[in-house]
Amino acid sequence: RGLGDVYKRQQIPLYYQYKSTGRPTALGGWCAKYIDIPTEPAYPFGYGLSYTTFNYGDITLDRTSMPMDGSLTAKVILTNTGSRDGAEVVQLYIRDKVAESTRPVKELKGFQKVFLKAGESREITFKITPDLLKYYNYELQYVAEPGAFDLMIGTDSQHVKTATFVLH
């Protein structure tokens, strides 16, 4: 087998700022407003290279409202659109849109490594339970709060498809 015949794909577990300092040089004055200066990562969390390409279909939810003692299923069709066989790490992120305390914009809650032959498609399924939505509040109680959530599935933290559901 040649080098290009063997499929290799690795994901990075962190992201790199586009500029190594995270902020531009202050010309003609001193600047310490790092938080106000927009920077995009050069490589987002979960980014990886591949010898092939993949396409994600839209997310379908079996319901858009989930009770505290229930669950819901999120599905997406993944297609290998390239000319080579390959593996893809399908990543699940969840965002709590309104919470008692500040929550991450995207929180990795699951992933699946899927191998597809060139041209092959497969339905990828994630089961969402209230346990995936829990966090420690200010009183150190492990809780899932009712409200709206964004569910994101994609190839890395920036290239995702989004669906919304409500926990009640």
Question: Where are the regions a protein language model picked out?
Answer:
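Terminal connector regions
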Residues: 129-168
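Surface-exposed loops/turns
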Residues: 68, 118, 145-146
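Short acidic, flexible loop segments centered on an aromatic residue
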Residues: 83-100, 106-108
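Intrinsic-disorder/low-complexity, polar/charged segments enriched in Ser/Thr/Lys/Arg/Asp/Glu/Gln
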Residues: 71-73, 121-125, 160-162
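Secreted, periplasmic, or luminal enzymes acting at the cell surface/secretory milieu
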Residues: 1, 5-87, 93, 150-154, ...
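Intrinsically disordered, low-complexity Pro/Gly/Ser/Thr-rich segments with frequent PxxP/GP/PP motifs
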Residues: 100-136
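Extracellular/lumenal ectodomain signal focusing on beta-strand-rich modules
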Residues: 53, 58, 110-113, 132, ...
